[in-house]
């Protein structure tokens, strides 16, 4: 391959726009809001790192440690009068749950937890504030 061919391929590759990780931005905003509004519960809301791409070896290692597909993105380990915990699945507008996520939702709810799909910071604020009113 000549220098010019390599250079043209590099230019084509670098001219592609990077995908905007909108879901990541929404989740970061939600966590920031929660930690500012509820500092006494800051360590009770945590992320479940299921979405990262992994090698087959690392994926097997994580499954052995208990990682499950379909688990919600955020979990609030605080019960209220009606539920044991709040599980929040983040989705950017226009995206929907995968079948494995719907299966996990059913199991989660069957075991006394609240599960919600959130597509914006405003939705998250409503859900969390309403959930924590019922303590």
Name these PLM-found stretches.
Residues 1-135:
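Catalytic phosphate/metal-binding cores of nucleic-acid and nucleotide-processing enzymes, i.e., regions
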């Amino acid at each position: 391959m000549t220098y010019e061919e390599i250079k043209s391929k590099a230019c084509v590759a670098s001219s592609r726009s990077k995908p905007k990780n909108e879901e990541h931005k929404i989740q970061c905003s939600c966590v920031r809001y929660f930690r500012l509004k509820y500092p006494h519960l800051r360590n009770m809301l945590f992320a479940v790192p299921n979405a990262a791409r992994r090698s087959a070896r690392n994926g097997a290692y994580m499954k052995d440690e208990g990682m499950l597909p379909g688990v919600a993105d955020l979990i609030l380990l605080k019960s209220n009068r009606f539920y044991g915990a709040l599980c929040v699945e983040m989705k950017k507008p226009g995206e929907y749950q995968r079948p494995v996520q719907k299966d996990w939702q059913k199991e989660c709810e069957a075991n006394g937890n609240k599960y919600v799909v959130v597509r914006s910071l405003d939705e998250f604020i409503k859900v969390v504030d309403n959930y924590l009113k019922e303590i």
